[in-house]
Regions:
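Mature soluble binding/inhibitory domains
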Residues: 1-273
Length: 273
């Protein structure tokens, strides 16, 4: 978060009946935890007199020798980025997006904005590319084709093949900007079965809630209901409620608007355990 480099805060977490946690320093906030996989929280920052909210997402620290082969594959992702100085000064709005991110076993990467790498690896829309550098402890530096440092990637991966990608984008205006990107492997969205359940979420707008799914049907905590279309606009994505979602076997829930007019936020959540 802007201006918070190296800052630390401490407190305690109280577990709620719905499986979420409340931090002692923010009684109206929720912390979402997938044990040994992922932690999702949110924080409010006052910048130039304007309240701004950001998500805080982390994966377990590992001392294992994580290699490119461990994280290789194609990921579906959602992201939120500040592309201008005005955005970082709270006089402009961030931009959310969705797309695909491919990593090879040699550490090269290709990103396709609002398009599917698998369908067109060499000329997908919004194509960008570069390389990853090993930093150790499950972290990787992301560099552009011109060797510009774009940020840091962290990965959860398990022996069973589950993966979660978390990318912290640094201050690099004119390309990816400052922000965040989250992804899960591109696999078929088999609605129902293990994907059924309740997912708690936090947003970059400063609110939280939950959505329950059963097959192709969903119900938000506020009472809104609807249906989902699996593998739309491509494999692993889900068309629902005016946006695109991902509900992964890893227990992760992600959502962002598919309308460019409303692409100023994203939602990250986890399945109730």
């Amino acid at each position: 978060a802007v201006g918070l480099d190296s800052s630390t805060h401490t407190g305690t977490l109280t577990k709620n009946s719905d499986g979420t946690y409340t931090p002692s320093s923010a009684q109206d906030a929720k912390v979402l935890i997938l044990p040994n996989k992922l932690a999702i929280a949110a924080t409010k920052l006052t910048i130039n007199g304007t309240d701004r909210y950001t998500l805080v997402v982390g994966v377990p620290t590992t001392t294992n020798n994580v290699q490119f082969s461990d994280i290789a594959g194609t990921y579906n992702y959602v992201s939120l980025q500040c592309l201008t100085v005005a955005c970082n000064n709270s006089t402009g709005a961030p931009e959310s997006a969705y797309g695909t991110f491919n990593i090879t076993t040699s550490g090269s990467w290709v990103e396709c904005t609002r398009s599917n790498y698998t369908a067109s690896p060499t000329n997908c829309a919004g194509r960008d590319s570069g390389a990853l550098n090993l930093l150790g402890n499950g972290k990787f530096q992301i560099t552009s084709a011109s060797s510009t440092n774009l940020g840091t990637a962290m990965f959860y991966h398990s022996p069973t093949g589950q993966k979660i990608m978390v990318i912290d984008l640094k201050n690099y205006f004119g390309s990816y900007g400052r922000g965040m990107m989250f992804g899960v492997p591109q696999v078929a969205a088999n609605l129902g079965g293990d994907l059924d359940g309740t997912y708690h979420w936090n947003t970059t707008l400063g609110n939280s809630g939950s959505v329950s799914t059963s097959g192709a049907n969903y119900t938000f905590s506020g009472g809104e209901t609807g249906t989902m279309i699996a593998d739309t606009p491509w494999l692993g994505m889900v068309d629902a409620a005016g946006g695109y979602a991902m509900m992964a076997d890893e227990g992760v829930y992600m959502f962002t608007s598919k309308s460019l007019a409303n692409d100023t936020y994203l939602v990250i959540g986890s399945k109730e355990q």
